[in-house]
């Protein structure tokens, strides 16, 4: 594969992860995620040992979502984890993990920083996604953009500063809060995201040095 093909593939993974953190899975999205093309994608991604366990868990949950009730239960899991700000939730905002304040505010420093990154790239958060710019879905989508439009050094700098600096804390919180849910879909998604970011960071470091 050429570097262009590799970066395109990396961008696709970041965009996929972003989309799964951005909103609940509805029936239309489920069809996309369980299509023949998607199954091939999941299988290929799962060949890597560091991704195999979470990918297998994700595939199992998706393939078992055969009723409206099961889909609603997964949507309720998403809501309880990411939309309800309680101690039993895992808020997906960088500010809440990086701010030195005891009670960090949304739309804080990390939001302003991400807004500036988006502005510099002539991008913006879509109007149908009314969330602060430091939402994990926005950050992962922007990393996908960088994969195809920026040098390796710029990608690594953004990954270190805006993702790797807080992702492990977020993932630990997701796993802690998701433990009460039987299918563990979002624990697997969070685990896969962390493993992907760590592997991508290593690859970028090797490419630079």
Swiss-Prot record:
Any one of the GO CC terms: cytoplasm
Spans through the membrane: none
Lineage: superkingdom: Bacteria
GO biological process: protein complex oligomerization; protein folding
Cytoplasm listed as a keyword: yes
Keyword Nucleotide-binding: no
Disulphide-bonded residues: none
Task of the protein: Involved in the biogenesis of TorA. Acts on TorA before the insertion of the molybdenum cofactor and, as a result, probably favors a conformation of the apoenzyme that is competent for acquiring the cofactor.
Family, per entry: Belongs to the TorD/DmsD family. TorD subfamily.
UniProt-listed NCBIfam families: PRK04976.1
Name of the protein in its database record: Chaperone protein TorD
Biological source species: Shewanella sp. (strain MR-4)
Lineage, opening ranks: Bacteria, Pseudomonadati, Pseudomonadota, Gammaproteobacteria, Alteromonadales
